[in-house]
Amino acid sequence: MAIHKIKIFSGRGSEYLAEKIAASFGTTLGQSEVLRFSDGEFQPCFNESIRGCTVFIIQSTFPPSDNLMELLMMIDAARRASAYKVVAVIPYFGWARQDRKDRPRVPIGAKLVANLLMAAGVDRVMTMDLHADQIQGFFDVPVDALYASGIFVPYIKSLNIEDLSIAAPDMGGAKRANTYAKHLSAPIIISHKERAKANVVGKMTAIGDVKGRNLSLIHISEPTRRRGIS
């Protein structure tokens, strides 16, 4: 069976993390650059041959949208340079909160991003802690949805925190927080949000006993603080 050489590249949105990943893999990042033009456009370029290679491109797609566009263009460039496989490693999957129509006449941003990645020619996607697990179903290519709990649970255990509770920032994060709570044998606190409008929380209620507890994960709300968190 043919073995295809692996090469790791980074977009400008994840350079530090990409260097750490490459070092852990026992290699260095591949040579690439992004050319800037006077009208504001940019053009990624691979500065070494990737023909027949399995190419990993590490790039988060958080705003600004240039990060997403840069990733799409790098995937396209790798395809046109005859890479064997192109794997997009997306530590932070932007637009993941837009996983459904929560009101009339709005897009489903996460599905659109999935379509764009597939149209660019990606063969596989790897990402961390998706906002909604169902986003994996938006793709027609394999998606490796990884979880940070494998790293953070041992770390939190090593701190030997007394009276520990695990907090979820909202109902959507309850499943993830529950995973931590089970591994850490700790009770869970959930925040229930009622939004007045986009990005504005009109009311937040902490569900669970937080008085005198040490909370871990993820956002500690003001209502939670007022109820006696230490």
Regions found by a protein language model. Give the residues of each.
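Short, glycine/charge-rich flexible loops or terminal/linker lids adjacent to PRPP-binding catalytic cores
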Residues: 30, 34-49, 96-102, 106, ...
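Glycine-rich anion/phosphate-binding loops
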Residues: 60-79, 102-115
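Single conserved hydrophobic/aromatic residue that forms the stacking wall/gate
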Residues: 218-230
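Residue-level signature of catalytic and energy-coupling elements of molecular machines
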Residues: 21, 88, 129, 170
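Positively charged, low-complexity intrinsically disordered leader regions
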Residues: 2-27, 32-41, 47
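Anion-binding alpha/beta catalytic cores of soluble intermediary-metabolism enzymes, centered on
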Residues: 103-163, 198
